[in-house]
C-alpha cells in the first residue's frame, strides 16, 4: 500500500456536484448563452458544465454536439492520432470489480514479459506500422518501477529498418515525485492515470482492495507527476 502523503486530500466537493446536477434544468436561452460562451475557448464553470449535462431537448443536444466539434477542431485540429497498447504484465494486487486483471480473477493466465519479449512485441508493432505506443502493466510489487523503466528503454531501442518508436505514452500506477522525475528522464510522451470515478463513495465500492483503494493518493497523482517534471498528463 502506498504511504499517505500529508498533502494528499479530496479536493472534490461531492455534495456540491450532486446539488448542481439535481437542480432544475436550464432554459433554452441559458443553454444557448453557455454554448456561445464556449466558442470563445476560455473554458466553462462547473455550474455551466452541469447545465449542459442536463440537456434533453434534441435541438439543443445537436447544437451542443456542433459546438463541441468546433471547439475540438479549434484546439486540436482535424487530425486523429493512433497508438498501440503494449501490456508488459497483467499481475495485479488490486481487486477492482470491473477489471479482468483483478487479483481474484482465476480464469486468466498471468504473465510478466521479459525484456527480450518486450523487444519482440515492439518489433511486431513496428512491422504493423505503429510508431506510437501506450505501455502499461498491472499494479503489484512484482512489477517493479525499475523494471518498467528498463522496459521503456528496451522498446525505444528497437529498430526495424529505418523505423523506431517515436513516442511511448505511459500508464503506470501512481508513484512518488522522485520516481516521476526518473520517469521524465526516459523521454516519455503523455502520462496517463485513470480515476474511473471521482465520487469517493462509489470509488470505495469499485475498488475494495489493493493500493488503488486509496482514493486520495490516486486523486492527487497528477500533482506529483507535474512536480516530478512531467508536463504532459
Regions found by a protein language model. Give the residues of each.
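Flexible, active-site-adjacent loop/turn segments at secondary-structure boundaries
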Residues: 42, 86, 90, 196, ...
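Short, functionally important structural connectors and interaction interfaces within domains
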Residues: 36, 45, 72, 83-84, ...
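Residue-level signature of catalytic and energy-coupling elements of molecular machines
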Residues: 41, 96, 193
Amino acid at each position: 500500500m502506498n504511504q499517505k502523503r500529508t498533502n494528499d486530500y479530496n479536493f472534490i466537493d461531492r455534495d456540491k456536484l450532486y446539488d448542481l446536477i439535481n437542480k432544475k434544468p436550464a432554459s433554452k436561452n441559458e443553454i444557448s448563452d453557455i454554448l456561445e460562451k464556449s466558442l470563445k475557448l476560455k473554458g466553462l464553470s462547473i455550474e455551466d458544465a452541469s447545465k449542459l449535462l442536463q440537456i434533453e431537448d434534441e435541438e439543443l443536444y445537436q447544437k451542443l454536439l456542433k459546438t463541441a466539434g468546433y471547439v475540438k477542431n479549434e484546439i486540436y485540429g482535424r487530425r486523429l492520432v493512433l497508438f498501440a497498447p503494449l501490456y508488459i504484465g497483467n499481475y495485479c494486487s488490486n481487486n477492482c470489480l470491473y477489471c479482468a486483471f483483478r487479483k481474484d480473477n482465476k480464469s486468466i493466465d498471468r504473465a510478466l514479459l521479459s525484456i527480450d519479449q518486450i523487444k519482440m512485441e515492439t518489433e511486431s508493432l513496428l512491422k504493423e506500422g505503429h510508431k506510437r505506443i501506450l505501455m502499461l502493466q498491472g499494479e503489484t510489487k512484482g512489477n517493479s518501477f525499475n523494471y518498467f523503466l528498463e522496459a521503456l528503454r528496451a522498446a525505444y531501442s528497437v529498430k526495424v529498418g529505418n523505423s523506431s518508436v517515436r513516442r511511448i505514452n505511459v500508464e503506470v500506477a501512481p508513484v512518488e515525485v522522485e520516481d516521476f522525475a526518473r520517469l521524465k528522464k526516459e523521454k516519455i510522451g503523455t502520462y496517463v492515470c485513470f480515476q474511473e470515478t471521482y465520487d469517493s463513495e462509489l470509488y470505495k465500492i469499485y475498488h475494495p482492495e489493493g493500493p488503488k483503494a486509496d482514493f486520495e493518493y490516486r486523486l492527487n497523482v497528477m500533482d506529483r507527476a507535474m512536480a516530478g517534471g512531467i508536463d504532459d498528463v
